[in-house]
């Protein structure tokens, strides 16, 4: 990735942040700003809200498969987001990291009616925290350049420590001018241009009433030269953002398993300690005109131990209405409406336009706190964490299509070998139908290899799997 470096400019500078919310037209209630603190809170309270996702992939049998969820080809983060290799002059290959769970974009919001300083640290005992912004004071485990660029870093006992974080409420940026309308307009212009510009997915998460977070990048013991771009990394800069962001990959079990039978019907079994407040089944299919069609159904509750079967799914004819349904579920879990809409806007493309079958449910907060302990000092009066589990499932028909693609590739390979008359042949490109699966192509090939009946298909699946893995390691 060709990194670009930005300095925090004065408030009056034009940094042009794009505040994009594509998920749905705001409701009438949304036109008014969220009340920063709940009615039961005092003006001195600190409220913390967080949302994010855990993504897994399984075959129709429900067994979760390893994949390489962080390959650069599938990353959509702005250049200013930091990673573990930053400052080491290292072309760190995230594509070498394998895991069963991708932890995507947890963003942590802070609500306060006065400026204050806090300390923030997050731990991931069974994972590796790989990317973050603003910069942290320290992270564990220490980055090992040799391991990170060869076999891939070990997953486990990871943490990020932002150290001291200054919180600045939006009200602090209201200009002292006599006309209230002018003051309001000027404040909005200032707020919309304070943060670094990023892509639509990242900046959508900023559309809330949360306080700004300000950090100061730590100074290294000696200047670090980036060997790739040839410039000096000069920390000590101030960073301003609307939230704390981090991402990672883990190896742990989530409480719910999804399976698909021969008819395509999807079932859930909850092996956790608490019932779930609902789950959505979403299918995105390729339409007759080539555009994706969206199908959905929902179960109101997923009890512990008893299988739950989805009916449907049913064609979504009004996407905005469906997005509102998702927003309502997130709000019922404790998020503010603007936060819920920001989350849906962030994930709209990935959740609702990528071809496939997926189940969504909200992880109980007790489970989130165990998987991903968050420490904030002083302790907030309220902490709400809503992590959405996304279970990507290969249906029987999906598995059949992948097997057919692999079989066709095997036939074409045999024909090329015959035509070459014993001469060496060049490696053919991976079939487009497999590449269309993105980061899920690797586990799909692994699943196909395990269920294929013909030896030629198993052999071809192995070849394609090796080819894909080699390509991912170079990205």
Mark where each language-model region is:
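Bacterial N-terminal signal peptides that target proteins for export
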Residues: 1-9
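Bacterial N-terminal signal peptides
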Residues: 9-18
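Intrinsic disorder/low-complexity segments
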Residues: 16, 25-26
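Sec/Tat signal peptide C-region and signal peptidase I cleavage site
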Residues: 20-22
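Protease-labile, long low-complexity intrinsically disordered regions enriched in Pro/Ser/Thr
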Residues: 26-475
